[in-house]
Curated annotation (Swiss-Prot):
NCBIfam families: TAT_signal_seq. The lineage of its organism: Bacteria, Pseudomonadati, Pseudomonadota, Gammaproteobacteria, Alteromonadales. NAD(+) binds at E64, R65, D86, W135, E136, W137, H138, E155, V156, N184, Y244. Substrate binds at Y213, R232, Y244, P245, T246, H247, Y326. It comes from Shewanella sp. (strain ANA-3). This is Glycosyl hydrolase family 109 protein 1. The keyword NAD applies. Residues 1-31 form the signal peptide. Belongs to the Gfo/Idh/MocA family. Glycosyl hydrolase 109 subfamily. It is an enzyme of class 3 (hydrolase). Pfam families: GFO_IDH_MocA, Glyco_hydro_109_C, TAT_signal. InterPro entries: Gfo/Idh/MocA-like_OxRdtase_N, Gfo/Idh/MocA_oxidrdct_glycsds, Glyco_hydro_109_C, NAD(P)-bd_dom_sf, TAT_signal, TAT_signal_bac_arc. Its EC number is 3.2.1.-. One of its GO terms (molecular function) is hydrolase activity, acting on glycosyl bonds.
C-alpha cells in the first residue's frame, strides 16, 4: 500500500475501524491488564481449512513488499490473482503490468482512499488476502479480512498493542479463519535445516536461544514521500523498545516449540541511548529539514531476555541504526551442542564428524548433505531462481499454498504471530519500569500445554 504519511501516522489507525484499539493508544498498557477473556469460538491451533482446488488471492498493498509477493505468486501453481488494492496509482500500475506480462488475467483494482480495501473484501471470489501495508494497518485489515470470511496473511509485525493481539485471536477463533503472520525467515534454508537438526536431537535438550534483527537502515530516512522510510522512521520517535522482533525470534520459537509444549513466560528489556539517527540526520540533511526536527527516542540497541515456562532463555536484540554487518544471530544451544548463524557454524559434543566441540565447524556442506530440510530439497532450486530474500519468500508462499490446497494446517498461526509480535510492546513496558519483568499473555488460553509440536514439515 502507498506508504501512509506522517499525518496518517499521527492520526493512527484507530480511526479506521470503530472499536479497534490501534497504534497510538494503549502503548503503555500493562500486559496483565488485558487478561484472557472467555473464548468466544474454539481454538485454531491446528486449524485446517477446507481444501481449495485453486487459491484465489487478493492483495492489500502492492508497494515495495507487496509487489514482491505479487511477483512470487505469479510463479506458483494453483493460484489466481483476483484483485489488488493500494492508494498509490503508480504501484498499482506496476503490479497490473507485471501480472499481465506473466500471462495471467488482469486483476480487479481498488483504490481511491484508505478504506478502499473494504471493497476488495466484499468480493466473494477471494479465499485469502495478503496484507503488506504500514504496521499500524496490519491488525485492523486482518480483522476486517477474517470478518469478511477470508483467511488473513499479514506482514510482520502482526499487531502493535496487547489489545490488538487479543482482538486478532478472538476474531480468528470466532470466525475459524487463519490469521498467519508471514514470518519468512522461518523458511530460510539454514533455519529449516536447524529445525530438522533440532527435531532429530542433534543438539540435545534445548536450553538457550539468541535472536536479532541487526540491519543498518538509516538510509531509509531519505525516503520522504514514498517507501518504507516515509512512515517507519517515525516509529523511532514514538517508542523505545524492540520495534521489530519477529525475524530472529520466529525460528528460535519454532525450535523450542513455543505455543506447542512451552510458551513465553516473562520478559525484561533494556535499551542503549538513542544517538545514531540524530547524528545521521545532522550529517545527511539540512539543519532546517524535518528529519532534524524529530526527537528520536528508540535506543540504538534494544536487548530483551525472555524466560519460558520450561525455564529456557532467549535473548532478542534490535538495532537498525548503528554501522555494523547484518545479523539475526540464530543461535540455539542444547545439552549436546550449538548452532550459530552469521556466519553459520556448529559445535557438538557427539555426532560432529570428528570435530572437537572446542572449535567451531564452519564447513557446512556435510551438514547440509545430512540435514538439509525436505522443503529445500524439493523446491530449493525453484526458490533460488525466483529469489525473495535468498529464496525464503518463495518457500514460505509455496508452503502456504500447499497447505491450503491439500487440507493441512499452516506452520504458523495467530497465537504465534501474537506471541512473537507482543515483544514490541512488552519490551517498552519493561524499559519504562526500570527493566523489571513483564508477563506474557497466554494467547492460547492454556492450549499450548497439549498442542502437537511442529514437526519436520514437508510436502
Amino acid at each position: 500500500m502507498h506508504n501512509i504519511h506522517r499525518r496518517h501516522f499521527l492520526k493512527a489507525a484507530g480511526a479506521v475501524t470503530a472499536g479497534l484499539v490501534t497504534a497510538n493508544i494503549a502503548l503503555n498498557a500493562n500486559a496483565s491488564s488485558v487478561a484472557p477473556k472467555p473464548r468466544v469460538g474454539k481454538s485454531v491451533i491446528g486449524l485446517i481449512a477446507p481444501k481449495m482446488e485453486l487459491v484465489r488471492v487478493g492483495f492489500i498493498g502492492v508497494g515495495e513488499r507487496g509487489f514482491s509477493h505479487v511477483e512470487q505468486f505469479c510463479h506458483l501453481e494453483g493460484v489466481e490473482l483476483k484483485a489488488i488494492c493500494d492508494t498509490h496509482q503508480a504501484v498499482i500500475d506496476r503490479a497490473v503490468e507485471h501480472i499481465v506480462k506473466q500471462n495471467r488475467p488482469k486483476p480487479a483494482v481498488y483504490t481511491g482512499n484508505d478504506l478502499s480495501y473494504r471493497e476488495l473484501l466484499n468480493r466473494d471470489d477471494i479465499d485469502i488476502v495478503i496484507i503488506s501495508t504500514p504496521w499500524e494497518w496490519h491488525a485492523p485489515m486482518a480483522i476486517d479480512t477474517m470478518e469478511s470470511g477470508k483467511h488473513a496473511f499479514v506482514e510482520v509485525p502482526l499487531a502493535l498493542t496487547v489489545e490488538e493481539c487479543w482482538q486478532l485471536v478472538d476474531t480468528a477463533e470466532r470466525t475459524q479463519k487463519n490469521c498467519m503472520m508471514m514470518e519468512n525467515v522461518n523458511y530460510g534454508r539454514e533455519e529449516l535445516m536447524v529445525l530438522n537438526m533440532v527435531r532429530q536431537g542433534v543438539f540435545g535438550e534445548l536450553l538457550h536461544g539468541e535472536a536479532a534483527y541487526i540491519h543498518e537502515l538509516r538510509w531509509q530516512m531519505k525516503e520522504i514521500d514514498h517507501k518504507t522510510g516515509s512512515w517507519r522512521t517515525y516509529w523511532h520517535t514514538k517508542r523505545n523498545g524492540n520495534l521489530y522482533p519477529t525475524h530472529g525470534l520466529g525460528p528460535i520459537s519454532q525450535y523450542m516449540n513455543i505455543n506447542r509444549g512451552d510458551r513465553f513466560d516473562y520478559l525484561t528489556s533494556m535499551s542503549s541511548p538513542a544517538l545514531g539517527r540524530a547524528l545521521y540526520a545532522k550529517r545527511e540533511f539540512p539543519a532546517d529539514h524535518e528529519r532534524n526536527q524529530l526527537k528520536y527516542i528508540n535506543g540504538d540497541m534494544s536487548t530483551s531476555l525472555i524466560k519460558t515456562v520450561k525455564g529456557r532463555t532467549i535473548m532478542v536484540q534490535h538495532d537498525t541504526t548503528t554501522p555494523r554487518p547484518y545479523s539475526r544471530h540464530n543461535l540455539i544451544q542444547g545439552t549436546n551442542g550449538v548452532f550459530a548463524g552469521f556466519p553459520n557454524r556448529i559445535a557438538v559434543e557427539h555426532g560432529g564428524f570428528g570435530k572437537s566441540y572446542h572449535e567451531w565447524d564452519m564447513d557446512m556442506q556435510k551438514w547440509y548433505d545430512k540435514y538439509d530440510h525436505p522443503l529445500w530439497q524439493r523446491i530449493g532450486k525453484e526458490a533460488e531462481i525466483n529469489g525473495g530474500h535468498g529464496g525464503m519468500d518463495f518457500v514460505m508462499l509455496w508452503r502456504m499454498v500447499y497447505c491450503l490446497r491439500n487440507g493441512e494446517a499452516l506452520d504458523q498461526d495467530v497465537y504465534d504471530g501474537a506471541a512473537w509480535s507482543v515483544v514490541n510492546i512488552l519490551s517498552e513496558q519493561s524499559l519504562n519500569n526500570r527493566s523489571n519483568s513483564v508477563n506474557f499473555p497466554d494467547f492460547t488460553r492454556g492450549a499450548w500445554e497439549h498442542a502437537t509440536p511442529l514437526g519436520i514439515v514437508g510436502a
